[in-house]
Amino acid sequence: MSLYPEIEPYDHGMLDVGDGNHVYWETCGNPHGKPAVVLHGGPGSRASPGLRRYFDPAAYRIVLLDQRGAGRSLPRASAPDTDMSVNTTAHLMADLERLRVHLGIERWLVWGVSWGSVLGLRYAQTHPGVVTELVLTGVATGSNAEVALLTRGLGNIFPEAHERFLAELPPDARDGNLPAAYNRLLESPDPAVRERAARAWTDWETATIPAPPGSVARYQDPDFRMGFARTVTHYWGNDHFLGDGNDEGVVIRDAHLLKGIPGTLVQGSLDFGNLLGIVWRLHHAWPDSDLVIVDEAGHDAGTTGDEALLAATDKYARGGTAE
């Protein structure tokens, strides 16, 4: 099973979501089809055209957006004067609700990758009445334990890269909240300091979470690199803005709020970025979910993962029934 053919949007726009922010959105596929919204990763990445291809364009009304500060949304997080205090998980969920209402959609399927899975899960827990299904891959829950693994624990597997990662920080900042320490550098008034920090952060990302060549190439764009690093460290350094109790994971703690929402979780067994054990616990706390484990696959679950994602969206387009 291959991805659906490339398609172009039939409509797009910039939605004023307040706080001086305008969010880019686009719609593809069938204007009268089953609504689905796609949540990209990062935080701070963008909605790439390839994400349109996980849905049957004859069956779905596919909505994509660039989250605050990312991609084509304005202002960009890469601009040093962009106010990041109005870029939080609560703001992003409110933006989704504004967009849903703007497009006249009553309920929609939520499809998320990596950080998009965290946002999608929390959105569904907060607004369960508007979510028909969840399809998630490269699944994370945004817990502090996951951030500690990504910024410290993986140093046991990639010691040389981790040494370089720590070397960019002042010595007195290497034992504390590493994302917050990097974020302070990325907020520096000195452009050279900001650029070194952005490059060091994305170098660590590419060393530990292998991705398709196209995804790695984007880090060579200074504007993308800066916006991505600034946004990720802003979220990771602030507990993903998920509130108290996130050391062990607010999303799994509140999994009961997903009751009645069908979901499909697709995870590579060798995903160092989001360990399978986290997804396993989420799956068992959410009885309405199906878990597809892709053997010997990483954060990008590859062709087998794509097949599972396509099977999920095809199934939900048929009302949740298998072929």
UniProtKB/Swiss-Prot annotation:
It is found in: Cytoplasm. It catalyses: Release of N-terminal proline from a peptide. Keywords: Aminopeptidase, Cytoplasm, Hydrolase, Protease. The active site is at 114 (nucleophile), 271, 299 (proton donor). GO terms for cellular component: cytoplasm. Residues 37-301 form the AB hydrolase-1 domain. InterPro entries: AB_hydrolase_1, AB_hydrolase_fold, Peptidase_S33, Pro_iminopeptidase. One of its GO terms (biological process) is proteolysis. This is Probable proline iminopeptidase. It comes from Streptomyces coelicolor (strain ATCC BAA-471 / A3(2) / M145).
